[in-house]
Amino acid sequence: MAGVEQREGAIQVQGQSLFFREALPGGGQAARFSVLLLHGIRFSSETWQNLGTLHRLAQAGYRAVAIDLPGLGRSKEAKAPAPIGELVPSSFLAAVVDALDLGPPVVISPSLSGMYSLPFLTAPGSQLRGYVPVAPICTDKINAADYARVKASVLIVYGDQDPMGQTSFEHLKQLPNHRVLVMEGAGHPCYLDKPEEWHTGLLDFLQGLA
């Protein structure tokens, strides 16, 4: 198995600087496709590095990029494009994808980051390869017709001890091409409670998209 190359840096998005971390397959191996990892309000791209998710994804042949959302982590100086709990125009995440040259990515979106990812997911002509919502906020702000139009494959993930997970699932289940991973005994950041189950389920889902 080839090694993994890691780097970090900053991109300019709509006039603001956003920090990112990236892991790639080593040895000049071409990545299969890109995975963009977002995060919740108490977390940052460092969460995915410490958990080993970036490394595991790169090891499996994917380009894994985690950003720090505006106002959080090492993007603290950047101003959020909308108040917490309000939907951010899809153009914001489109600009992130463009700045990082990701191509059509899979987006992993826990909790707070739903305000960024859901408009991007449901935008007309969305270029998402896949979507992995982990109990995201704002699921009630998307209408049934917009959910029904989504063509991307979706893996809905949540912990069975997380009321928000069940609430968000009631909306997300309207996505036509979805499967569900419920983690027993896990809370809101279920990927932290059950990292092995998280990585196994995620890699299995990605394998099916290849």
From Swiss-Prot:
GO biological process, one term: positive regulation of transcription by RNA polymerase II
Record keywords, A-Z: Acyltransferase, Cytoplasm, Nucleus, Phosphoprotein, Transferase
Known EC number: 2.3.1.-
Subcellular location per the Swiss-Prot or TrEMBL entry: Cytoplasm; Nucleus
Pfam families per record: Abhydrolase_6
Leader peptide range in chain numbering: none
Residues with the Phosphoserine modification: S91
Family: Belongs to the AB hydrolase superfamily. ABHD14 family.
Function: Acts as an atypical protein-lysine deacetylase in vitro. Catalyzes the deacetylation of lysine residues using CoA as substrate, generating acetyl-CoA and the free amine of protein-lysine residues. Additional experiments are however required to confirm the protein-lysine deacetylase activity in vivo. Has hydrolase activity towards various surrogate p-nitrophenyl (pNp) substrates, such as pNp-butyrate, pNp-acetate and pNp-octanoate in vitro, with a strong preference for pNp-acetate. May activate transcription.
Protein's name in the database: Putative protein-lysine deacylase ABHD14B
